Amino acid sequence: MARKTVAAALALVAGAAVAVTGNAPAQAVPPGEKDVTAVMFEWNFASVARECTDRLGPAGYGYVQVSPPQEHLQGGQWWTSYQPVSYKIAGRLGDRTAFKNMIDTCHAAGVKVVADSVINHMANGSGTGTGGTSFSKYDYPGLYSGSDMDDCRATISNYQDRANVQNCELVQLPDLDTGEDHVRGKIAGYLNDLASLGVDGFRIDAAKHMPAADLANIKSRLTNPNVFWKLEAIHGAGEAVSPSEYLGSGDVQEFRYARDLKRVLQGEKLSYLKNFGEAWGHMPSGQSGVFVDNHDTERGGDTLSYKDGANYTLASVFMLAWPYGSPDVHSGYEWTDKDAGPPNNGQVNACYTDGWKCQHAWREISSMVAFRNTARGQAVTNWWDNGNNAIAFGRGSKAYVAINHETSALTRTFQTSLPAGSYCDVQSNTPVTVNSSGQFTATLAANTAVALHVNATGCGSTPTTPPTTPPATSGASFNVTATTVVGQNIYVTGNRAELGNWAPASALKLDPATYPVWKLTVGLPAGTSFEYKYIRKDAAGNVTWESGANRTATVPASGQLVLNDTFRS
């Protein structure tokens, strides 16, 4: 029956530890040597496919996570993707063919695919879904009816009451009775269908609102019951349902990790991070999924977001360097309206245009993916801090990172366990020499980092990260030769909205992968005449404009305009 009594719910919980372990052996950390996931929030499947080839594979990302692929409620808001109408692959991000092509393309690039999976509830309201399926609340023809829902039709109101959390409706969304055999079978069928197309793992949305034993039963029905799962179970002090209940089924997302990073970066000391992780009360490292932000928390404000500038970037650098959990790198789009859906309905023509932030491609972040892969299995060594906001540490004899979150530059000779030789600081593409004692000297500007690893032993024309943007249909390809010091970056701005309308804060960052040539392709309408200039920014936000008059150019009637410039001092 649809109703789960309180006694039954408690009985399920009492047996959850045994049931979860017995039915579905844990698969926590993603298998393989590459455990970083790029979370491409609301990117359509064609754009994800291209990104796997152009950036994610070459940068060393092990996984890409895509937003929910199933048919969903119509509407321009992002959250419509999280209101299923059916389990057909027919959402705003692409159809079954596009989904399969994306998986195959990503696999060819060496990137596995995780699908965000909404199995706790169905869509609210009534109408026609994105794939043409008619529905009304509690009635989803051919899939579920009212008897498949939990009997509590009220909105969750008491997180200290387990039955209320797991049997009532999350923000009025019809709550599936995951204790029913029919419901379990339908959910397993959906996940098996995705797996048949090549999906390698699943993020289980709203896992805390389903009993752990129910999820273990569903997982046991999968063709591969050991498939990678990552469960969203938000920690709340004093709540009836604890994220640790779900550790038997896979990675559990450790929300306290992101909240603690925000608190430290914004108001405490980086030196506190010396024992960050389990010693802070976080879940076991090998069963935890970690992140700096996700699509919910960046809007809710309980974690950092792209709007936090250097705090966000340095938190990401630390996360990827520190040996705790399996990291997610969130990559979304700019927003002022928290409900606003993706630009261009999820089509990404080029990074850093149309509001797409592409955090996964920021040099400071993407370069740390190879750092993490190289350092895998190595313990923290050579910890140093100044008792405040400058820290440094090694990962055995494989890697070393220094982070300066002070308000002024830091010059220091750092002691590492690296072999002597020439290295490339992957944060700035700057050569660094480690002497026979394992030492190097560097100056870090405020709010910057230096990162070395044994697989980056020279800076040259070979990109250490993929190109910043894929080709645009029409537009301008900016290529400017400019020298910088650690902490500085080159940007372009101009007299069009796509170029930031001359506002330094909205200028577009170029990629130094082929330093000293900085590159960026920007989509612009064919035939457009525009003015532009390059600027140099440091970590403190100081701006230096290149000298001389505004540069001028015109996009051709078809194709791209290629601009080869030199920064005018």
Curated annotation (Swiss-Prot):
This is Alpha-amylase. Ca(2+) binds at N120, Q166, D175, H209. Residues 1-28 form the signal peptide. SUPFAM superfamilies: (Trans)glycosidases (SSF51445), Glycosyl hydrolase domain (SSF51011), Starch-binding domain-like (SSF49452). Its EC number is 3.2.1.1. It catalyses: Endohydrolysis of (1->4)-alpha-D-glucosidic linkages in polysaccharides containing three or more (1->4)-alpha-linked D-glucose units. GO terms for molecular function: alpha-amylase activity; metal ion binding; starch binding. It comes from the Bacteria. The active site is at D205 (nucleophile), E232 (proton donor). Monomer. Induction: By maltose, and repression by glucose. It is an enzyme of class 3 (hydrolase). The record marks D296 as: Transition state stabilizer. Keywords: Calcium, Carbohydrate metabolism, Glycosidase, Hydrolase, Metal-binding, Signal. The keyword Hydrolase applies. Belongs to the glycosyl hydrolase 13 family. Pfam families: Alpha-amylase (PF00128), Alpha-amylase_C (PF02806), CBM_20 (PF00686). InterPro entries: A-amylase/branching_C, A-amylase_C, Alpha_amylase, Carb-bd-like_fold, CBM20, Glyco_hydro_13_cat_dom, Glyco_hydro_b, Glycoside_hydrolase_SF. One of its GO terms (biological process) is carbohydrate metabolic process. PANTHER family: ALPHA-AMYLASE. Residues 468-569 form the CBM20 domain. Its cofactor is Ca(2+). Binds 1 Ca(2+) ion per subunit. PROSITE patterns: CBM20.
